[in-house]
């Protein structure tokens, strides 16, 4: 595992979704609806965030006959990291937008 999290726009979007209520457990399907990301994009991001220990993941028992569901929430480090990543991402993109306006 690389020592640095790859910060894509999609990863920022997922982190931002968790920041809406950092203590809440979230389902992948719910996150997919919130972010608009397809499962093939979302689940690798969730796995990577869990690998970096920014998310905790567990299985939730469901009604009889239904399979258990994976649920996720931010860890304390994940909350701190999400806030830092989103702040730096926002600043970087604000500068890029300002530079583009100056150039045009």
Where are these regions (language model features)?
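Basic, amphipathic "hinge/linker" alpha-helix immediately C-terminal to the N-terminal HTH DNA-binding motif
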Residues: 64, 68-86
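Amphipathic alpha-helical dimerization/coiled-coil segments
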Residues: 80-104
């Amino acid at each position: 595992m690389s020592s640095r999290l790859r910060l894509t726009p999609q990863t920022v979007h997922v982190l931002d979704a968790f920041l809406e209520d950092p203590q809440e457990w979230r389902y992948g399907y719910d996150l997919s609806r919130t972010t608009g990301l397809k499962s093939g994009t979302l689940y690798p991001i969730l796995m990577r965030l869990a690998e970096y220990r920014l998310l905790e993941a567990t299985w939730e028992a469901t009604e009889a006959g239904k399979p258990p569901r994976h649920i996720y929430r931010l860890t304390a480090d994940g909350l701190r990291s999400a806030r830092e990543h989103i702040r730096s991402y926002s600043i970087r993109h604000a500068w890029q937008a300002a530079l583009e306006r100056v150039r045009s």
